[in-house]
């Protein structure tokens, strides 16, 4: 069997790593060892932050809802409790969007929640 030299394979592998490391600073973009480590770490950060993004957005929606219901005389937790009691099933993303873009509709929902708490 003929001897196989690994030049072509190694070059292709390195090229793949360098492509993934494009835009990195310093040695991280042009030294294979540093580039490989940087690309691995970038993948870890990407995986972690895809999970974290969901938490971050939920927190943002909650802050927006809280800011919108305070002038109406409620806190966020009281408002959510009122929604649950009134049977309104609207998620936080939609509530946040309504609070920003459709304040009249949001106010109507808030009044319904307030009425459910009073009853």
Curated annotation (Swiss-Prot):
State the InterPro entries in the record: Ribosomal_bL20, RIBOSOMAL_L20_CS, Ribosomal_protein_bL20_C
The cross-references to SUPFAM superfamilies, in alphabetical order and at most eight, read: Ribosomal protein L20
What domain of life is recorded for the organism? Bacteria
Look up the record and give one Gene Ontology term from the biological process aspect.
Answer: ribosomal large subunit assembly
> What are the UniProt keywords, alphabetically?
Ribonucleoprotein, Ribosomal protein, RNA-binding, rRNA-binding
Question: Which is one Gene Ontology cellular component term of this protein?
Answer: ribosome
Any GO MF annotation of the entry:
rRNA binding
Q: Which HAMAP family match?
A: Ribosomal_bL20 (MF_00382)
Q: What does this protein do?
A: Binds directly to 23S ribosomal RNA and is necessary for the in vitro assembly process of the 50S ribosomal subunit. It is not involved in the protein synthesizing functions of that subunit.
What family is this protein classified in?
Answer: Belongs to the bacterial ribosomal protein bL20 family.
Q: What is this protein called?
A: Large ribosomal subunit protein bL20
Source organism per UniProt: Rhodopseudomonas palustris (strain BisA53)
